[in-house]
């Protein structure tokens, strides 16, 4: 009985570990901001309040914050999105929110690997 329980627990841990891995086929994109506040590496990237990726790096270049993100290719985020830094609540963590500007038709093309989100 104990052997079965141990085997079950090991199986659950392996499945969880494999599911938590960042897929190597993630779409890597970049956005530049004047200010990101206390945005942290590994912060979620959301679209329509659904997580579609995560922040992989934050660095300074030309007096602006450059944020690298890994986006799930299955999310098919349109190429014309705008990236905004916002809080999840008044005291909550900062996240990246991807939105399509009002009045702008959705692009038929998803974000390409290496793309820069130009409007932030």
Which residue ranges define each predicted feature?
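Sec-dependent N-terminal signal peptides
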Residues: 3-13
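C-terminal motif of bacterial Sec signal peptides marking the signal peptidase cleavage site
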Residues: 18-20
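Bacterial signal peptide processing site
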Residues: 22-25
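Short alpha-helix capping/helix-loop boundary micro-motifs
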Residues: 30-34, 68-71
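Short beta-strand/strand-turn micro-motif
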Residues: 34-66
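Non-cytosolic, membrane-proximal linker/loop modules
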Residues: 58-120
């Amino acid at each position: 009985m104990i052997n079965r329980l141990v085997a079950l627990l090991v199986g659950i841990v392996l499945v969880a570990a494999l599911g938590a891995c960042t897929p190597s086929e993630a779409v890597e994109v970049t956005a530049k901001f004047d200010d990101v506040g206390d945005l942290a590496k590994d912060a979620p990237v959301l679209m329509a309040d659904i997580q579609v990726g995560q922040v992989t790096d934050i660095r300074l270049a030309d007096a602006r914050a450059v944020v690298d993100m890994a986006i799930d290719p299955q999310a098919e985020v349109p190429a014309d999105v705008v990236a905004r830094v916002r809080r999840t609540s008044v005291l909550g963590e900062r996240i990246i929110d991807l939105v399509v500007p009002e009045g702008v038709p959705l692009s038929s093309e998803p974000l390409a690997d290496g793309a820069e989100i130009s409007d932030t």
